[in-house]
Amino acid sequence: MEKKFDAIIIGSGVIGAAISFELAKKGWKTLNIDKHPTSGFGSTSASCAIIRVHYSTFDGCALAYEGYHYWKKWEEYLEYKDESGLALFIECGCMIYQTHENDYLKNIIARANELQIPFEKWDPKLIKSKLPIVDTRQFGPVKLTSD
């Protein structure tokens, strides 16, 4: 039996799956090919599957902010009511520290302003009041006390 596809997509992670989904909605027959055995092995697994709108390029920020609006209406976008709650978007925010190493987020703040992406600037006192567990005296990654 000969199998024919309108599009063969290399990768079936978040990008490949999204491309396939959009083409399928337009009636295309698609095939995704991926080097990994199943989901959860790609870049999304390293990011805890968070979405963010702060990237190093203008285009990256613009595309991410456009995508954010799809995530907010995730079930509507999927055209599917997920009774199990698996396809659930939980908006929890994201906190990034302004440090010398990231040039105090100058470029990210400029892009957010240019694209009218809302954000809040919290000082250490506000951080402590909202998130008492956070130690604002250090900005490094989490590590074991034995390190």
Model-identified regions with their sequence ranges:
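Beta1/beta-strand and adjacent pyrophosphate-binding region of the FAD-binding site
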Residues: 1-15, 31
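C-terminal lid/capping helical subdomain adjacent to the catalytic/cofactor pocket in oxidative enzymes
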Residues: 2-5, 26, 121
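Anionic group-transfer/hydrolysis microenvironments
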Residues: 8, 36, 54
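Short beta-strand/turn micro-motifs composed of small residues
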Residues: 11, 34, 98
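Glycine-rich FAD pyrophosphate-binding loop
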Residues: 24-44
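Dinucleotide-binding Rossmann-like beta1-alpha1 core, especially the glycine-rich loop
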Residues: 48-140
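Short, intrinsically disordered, charge-balanced linker/junction segments flanking boundaries
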Residues: 140-147
